[in-house]
UniProtKB/Swiss-Prot annotation:
EC number(s) from the headed UniProt entry: 1.1.1.23
Annotated source species: Methanococcus maripaludis (strain DSM 14266 / JCM 13030 / NBRC 101832 / S2 / LL)
Gene that encodes the chain: hisD
Protein name as annotated: Histidinol dehydrogenase
Example GO molecular function: zinc ion binding
Binding of Zn(2+), residues: 256, 259, 356, 415
Length: 424
């Protein structure tokens, strides 16, 4: 772990921090491309082949039955079900307000009406990771905004748990009102959603995080379908000053570090003394933490850097973190200068896990500095905004000279004539 003043970071150290473990998919593109081509050509037969190869099971029917969903409720703790239901309510409420703040509008000027309307995509596919662990919270985060946006058909794909679906994933899908759940994962699931098979419908957009093969597949099918954004290892930047609580900072650091050996955790702090206290607390907490094998690897991707609050803000904006915690004396004042972040957590009582599960905001967020150009998953992800225009003859006359002049300048004489014929 680097512990150093921002002003003293050399070019290599700064590059390690800013260009953290970005997902390099070039080496697996031929393999993923072959999988996608096979799924496109052979449909369900290809899916069965890859499920046997990668998951070690034979599945004839990928769609989860109503009976299987009903049984799933009996297989998980009732408190987990209750927590999923409560989390769903918060997530749904947040995204409903988000949807209400999307506006259709129209201007009316001299015989020209021009505006924008809002329409959802027709079908959405939500990929939910599996493998080492299953993530029912990701079901809520992907399905809920799609349903709120008005998507007619929202389906979930997730790797099988043996020959069945993971019970918590099935329950979460039912709570979020998914229209279909399929026991299929990996690049082959992305291919099924992009091209459609006999059993799995083709969708218009694919959302949700996944491993490097899923990320590569999403990039390759983009254009055939829309996607949310590329996803990489999870990351957090925690901004601190003298007022910050070292215990809270250390625990939030470990909460991120336990995600993945490639997770990145950066702490910016305004004093060297505070930086040392935070480092000591982190090392102390690691001794009794769970998932230490993962934490000890991800800590190699981490740093504590010291600088003025302005230097810390500048570094944060360059880093563009997936999660940004501002644990300073006046977090809302710092917020005014933040340009790039996936989701922002203010003050001592807003750790990243609340956004991961229950505050209502979405946890599917851009990583690897993609927050410079992407927002997190939202109802807008599933929305199209067609523009509309209606002109009177007087309105057309008022702009006809502009249209005909520019059309003819570009050599598009029939464009010009289409206007002139209406005015003759």
């Amino acid at each position: 772990m680097i512990v150093k003043k921002i002003s003293k970071l050399n070019e290599k150290e700064l590059d390690i921090i800013l260009n953290r473990n970005k997902t390099n998919i070039s080496g697996i593109l031929p393999t993923v491309s072959e999988i996608l081509e096979n799924v496109q050509k052979n449909g369900d037969n290809a899916l069965k082949e890859y499920t046997k190869k990668f998951d070690g099971v034979d599945i004839d029917n990928f769609k989860v039955s109503t009976e299987e969903i009903d049984k799933a409720y009996d297989k998980i703790d009732s408190k987990v079900v209750e927590s999923l239901e409560k989390a769903y309510e918060n997530i749904r409420e947040f995204h409903e307000i988000q949807f209400k703040n999307l506006n259709e509008w129209e201007i009316d000027k001299k015989g020209i009406k021009a505006g924008q309307i809002i329409r959802p995509v027709e079908k959405a596919g939500c990929y939910v990771p599996g493998g080492r662990a299953f993530y029912p919270s990701t079901v809520l985060m992907t399905v809920t905004p799609a349903k709120v946006a008005g998507v007619k058909e929202v389906i979930v794909t997730s790797p099988p748990n043996g020959t069945e679906g993971n019970p918590a994933t099935l329950v979460a899908s039912d709570i979020a009102k998914a229209d279909g759940i399929y026991k299929i994962g990996g690049a082959q699931a992305i291919g099924a959603l992009a091209y459609g098979t006999k059993s799995i419908p083709k969708v218009d957009i694919i959302v949700g995080p996944g491993n490097i093969f899923v990320t590569a597949a999403k990039k390759l099918v983009y254009g055939e379908v829309s996607i949310d954004f590329p996803a990489g290892p999870s990351e957090v930047l925690i901004m601190c000053d003298e007022s910050s609580n070292e215990e809270y900072v250390a625990m939030d650091f470990l909460a991120q570090a336990e995600h993945d050996p490639n997770a990145s955790c950066i702490i910016t702090v305004t004093s060297e003394k505070k930086a040392e206290k935070i480092k000591e607390r982190i090392l102390m907490e690691i001794k009794t933490a769970k998932r230490t094998e993962i934490i000890e690897k991800s800590i190699l991707n981490s740093a504590i850097v010291i600088g003025s609050i302005d230097e810390c803000i500048e570094l944060s904006n360059s880093y563009a973190p997936e999660h940004l915690e501002i644990m300073t004396k006046n977090p809302r004042e710092v917020l005014k200068s933040i340009e790039n972040a996936g989701s922002i957590f203010l003050g001592n009582y807003a750790p990243v896990p609340v956004g991961d599960y229950a505050s209502g905001t979405n946890h599917v967020l851009p990583t690897s500095a993609c927050a410079k150009m992407y927002s997190g998953l939202s109802v807008e992800t599933f929305i199209k905004k067609p523009t509309v225009q209606e002109l009177t003859k007087e309105g057309l006359l008022g702009i006809s000279d502009i249209v005909t002049t520019l059309a003819e300048a570009e050599g598009l004489f029939n464009h010009s004539e289409a206007v002139k014929r209406r005015l003759n």
